[in-house]
Structures are given as C-alpha cells and as structure tokens.
Amino acid sequence: MSERASRETWRLKRRVDHIPRMLRDLSPASQSKRLVVLGRSSALQGLVRQIVIWLGFVVGFALVSSLAGNRAHVALANGLRVVEAEKWLLHGLPELVVQRTVASSAVLTFLTVLTYRASEFVVVSAALVWVYLRRRWAFTQFRNTIFAASLVALVCYFVLPTAPPRMFPGLGFVDTVAHAGGPSRDPGVLSLAANEYAAMPSLHAADALIVGVTIALLARRRLVKVVALLWPAWVWLCVMATGNHFALDVVAGSVVAGLSGAAVHAHARAFPSSSADSPASALR
C-alpha cells in the first residue's frame, strides 16, 4: 500500500507542477509572444507569395516585350527622330557629352555599367522586399506603381519601338556595357527574351524615380532619404552614359512614373480596402 500511495503522490505532484507552466502559457506575455511568432510566420509566407508574383511579372513582361522587338527598321527610324528632336530642342546631343565625360574615368565607367545592370531588377527587387518587411502598409501602392509603369512602357514598346543611342555608332555613340564585357541588356535568362528596341520610354528611369521617391518618403534616417532622392538622377546619368537611352527617353520614363504613381494613388483613395495593407501587420 505504501508503494501505491507513493506512486499516486508522485503523479499528483507532477500534475501540480504543470499548473504554473499552464498559467504561464495563458499569461498576456506568452500570448503576445505567440502572436509575434504567428505574425512573423504569416509575414514570411506573404513575402514568398509576393516574390513569386514579382518574378512571374518580370518573366511575363520580358517575354511579351520580346514580341515587340522584331521591327528593327521602324525602331531605327524612330531613334533617328529622337535624335532630330533633341537637336531641335536641346541644340545638340547631351548623351555624347555625358558618355565622353564618363569614359575618361575607369571608375566612373565601372560604376555606371554596374548601376545599369543592377538598377532595373536587383535594386527594384530589394526595394520591394524592404517595403514589404518594414512598411507593409505602403507595399501595395508601391508594387502596383511599378506594375503600372511597366505596362504603360510595354504598350509604348509595341506602338513606338525605338532604338537606343548605342545602335548609332556613326553619330559617335558607344555601347559602354558591351565594351565592359557581358551582355548589353540585363544578364541571366531574361537576356534571351530581351527587347533591344525598348528605349522609349526608359523603364530604368521610371523605376528609379518610383523607387527613389518611395524610399525617401518611407525612410526615417535623413541619410537614406538623401541617397534615395539622388538615386533617380544617378540612374538617369548612367543610362545615358552607357548609350542605352536618350535624354528624351529619360524624360518620357519620368512622365510615365509620375502618371502611374498618380493613377495608383487615385485608385487607392477611391478603393482603400483593395489598395492598401494594414499598418498593424508591418514588421518594425
């Protein structure tokens, strides 16, 4: 009997020992920790979903855009029209001055080529991830503005295929990216579906402006704001220095960015429930 009583006492003690743990699990602090874990898990799943959407959009855009790249004679003629327009409006070709200035410095050449190759996909992707993780309430508008600008540009590439400056060596332009080594367009699988006549408007210029303004508005540190505001101007210089866009391409890209941002913002105000994420879900 004493052995049986001892076992019952031990079992009762184990049950009693579990009570503080159960109470701790029911405490506000414990519940808060669980909510944080669930929130982070949900954020990770959401991030993966958004990455898939973004990559799908990029691949789809490249494939559709490539369908507009088979009218070389039209694109070259339109490129010459841009040249004539710049000579009339600007009394010259500012891209030539930019190219020659940058070409005089190996460091500047390296930086402009690196920026051209990375600014369109790498930087935009990084900005999307940062906004999603740190300012998720602004993510939908940011992403949709990128999408809208890309779709407007895509329509322009079909309607108005335009050759970039690098295709006019007779005017003094140089394909800086090709001379630096590697493909003229973005590296990787997407280069197989690249549209060589997608100069007007400059999507590099449009996306740089969208990214720069968005990060400047959302960032808290002054240095980050300043760098973000300078980013578009630097990209604009780089796309001209590498011979990939005329100045008018950059202007057109900036207009596309502005109109896309205004349209997405107007839609968000008209339909707030479908155009914004909850601030409470953002990871600080």
What spans do the regions from the language model cover?
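N-terminal transmembrane-helix/juxtamembrane module of multi-pass inner/ER membrane proteins
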Residues: 2-123, 283
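Alpha-helical transmembrane segments of integral membrane proteins
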Residues: 45, 49, 53, 140-145, ...
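Membrane-interface loops
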Residues: 65, 72-84, 132-224, 271-284
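Hydrophobic alpha-helical transmembrane segments
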Residues: 114-129, 204-212
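Interfacial helix-loop-helix junctions of multi-pass membrane proteins
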Residues: 164-171, 195-199, 234-260
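Hydrophobic transmembrane alpha-helices
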Residues: 212-217, 257-265
